[in-house]
Amino acid sequence: DRVRETLFNWLASLAGVGGGGLPGWHCIDAFAGTGALGLEAASRGAASVLLVEQESALVDQLLKLKTKLAAEAVRIERGNGVTALERTTANSMHAVFLDPPFESPALYEPSLRAAARAVHDDGAVYLEAPRLWNDEELAPLGLHLYRHLKAGAVHAHLLRKGPASAA
């Protein structure tokens, strides 16, 4: 879809690679759902992708899809996305994908805080949310808005580490 294509164009520009590739990148999709974002990163050359999902039925689907696609760079873990991010080595991820359930607003702040710790200084955090997150809200979490796109009811954010003045 258009949002996903835009996201991966944004990420490829950060990676400095033509053709939309993410070679050597380490990524985590903390609320994987169908795995679309993480699997797309793997298809674009990411070295490792961790898909984290709580619902066992979705985890089963992800495992089948990983096998079908022979996605060797992909690991799948059943669990809480925030907890997985908190366990991730600091500054180790080039891309952190956050698409928490829109009906769970309490997940956003802890997810963003954990993502800011996990993401590499040259990396990015992608957030899908039902509303725009501005720099005033993001700054205490250690992030700033780098790119934004609104598509229907979805606000797609690409966030970077540090204050907005570092953009």
Predicted ranges, named:
Residues D1-A167:
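Class I S-adenosyl-L-methionine-dependent methyltransferase catalytic core
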